[in-house]
């Protein structure tokens, strides 16, 4: 059966238009400009019908670039941008003056995994800004890589209970080590009790950075664990292109995602995880 697919995690960046500090000096294949046109053929062949662009740097230039790309794309229906969460007054102003009136602006993210303090989100100013997001029902993408990021997100959930959040890339489960399921699993069982949390099945082909020979059977237990505890209704998928190129191409990434989803959820839930849940979460 053919299902429509929403790719909730696509990146684009233009090194001529904005600075991406995390790429500077890198010898990675990621250290160049990436444009949506590069995946057009594979996207169509993979059956991806809609997408969400996700921020790749903590500045407004990146957000504005994504919005320009989305408007011209014909298939991107949402942007997860950036706001200066350390400045609640400016966050409120930008929302009121600009982004609440921008139909493509669907969520906010900050590169918390690049902050020295894993508790960055718990600063009073940031919590105030997150409360502003919650008041406007704008969701927040949690891009964590450590157990401490899960712990921090759970505190945020207690402090701002109406804030909807999604753990990007399942907050990096211990796929590379093969541990089942360690501290990640213990914390996710608790996080699942906060019904504002959702899980994004994405970036798992490169989880932990050790992706040589990574197979679907290596990843499957962690996706199964996620669905068991969060329920299929709180899960959706993303491709994480172009970061995913470190492991495989765009079409192969989506073949993997589909295989994982079809293995762990009932046939009646596949469409929800591949598209419907994402549409509901981001209001696409």
What do the predicted segments below correspond to?
Residues 31-38, 58-62, 87-90, 125, ...:
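Soluble or luminal CAZymes and related metallo-dependent hydrolases
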Residues 2-6, 29-50, 225, 229-236, ...:
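Mid-to-C-terminal alpha-helical segments outside catalytic/metal-binding sites
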Residues 10, 56, 83, 170, ...:
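Active-site metal-binding loops of divalent metal-dependent hydrolases
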Residues 9, 51, 66, 79, ...:
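Conserved, mostly hydrophobic/aromatic
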Residues 120-236:
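Catalytic pocket-lining loop regions of alpha/beta-barrel enzymes
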Residues 61-148, 154-155, 203-204, 211-213:
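Active-site gating/metal-coordination segments in enzymes
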Residues 61-77, 160-166, 219-228, 250-261:
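Short, electropositive alpha-helical surface patch
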Residues 1-65, 70-71:
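An N-terminally biased module of ancient metal coordination in phosphate/nucleic-acid-related enzymes
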């Amino acid at each position: 059966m053919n299902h429509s697919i929403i790719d909730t995690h696509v990146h684009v960046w233009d090194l001529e238009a904005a600075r991406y500090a995390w790429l500077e000096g890198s010898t990675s294949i990621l250290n160049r400009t990436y444009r949506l046109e590069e995946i057009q053929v594979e996207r169509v062949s993979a059956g991806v019908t809609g997408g969400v662009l996700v921020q790749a740097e903590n500045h407004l230039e990146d957000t504005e670039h994504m919005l320009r790309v989305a408007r011209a794309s014909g298939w991107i229906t949402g942007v997860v941008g950036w706001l200066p969460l350390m400045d609640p007054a400016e966050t409120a102003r930008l929302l009121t003056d600009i982004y609440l009136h921008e139909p493509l602006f669907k969520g906010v993210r900050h590169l918390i995994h690049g902050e020295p303090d894993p508790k960055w989100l718990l600063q009073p100013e940031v919590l105030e800004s997150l409360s502003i997001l919650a008041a406007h029902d704008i969701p927040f993408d949690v891009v964590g890589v450590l157990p401490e990021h899960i712990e921090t997100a759970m505190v945020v959930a207690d402090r701002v209970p109406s804030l909807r959040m999604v753990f990007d890339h399942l907050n990096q489960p211990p796929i590379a080590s093969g541990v089942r399921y360690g501290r990640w699993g213990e914390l996710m069982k608790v996080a699942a009790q906060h019904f504002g949390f959702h899980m994004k099945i994405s970036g798992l082909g490169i989880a932990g950075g050790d992706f040589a020979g990574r197979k679907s059977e290596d990843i499957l237990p962690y996706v199964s664990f996620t669905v068991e505890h969060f329920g299929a209704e709180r899960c959706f998928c993303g491709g994480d292109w172009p970061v995913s190129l470190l492991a495989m191409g765009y079409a192969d990434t989506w073949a993997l995602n589909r295989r994982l989803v079809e293995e762990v959820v009932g046939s009646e839930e596949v469409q929800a995880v591949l598209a419907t849940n994402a549409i509901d979460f981001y209001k696409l």
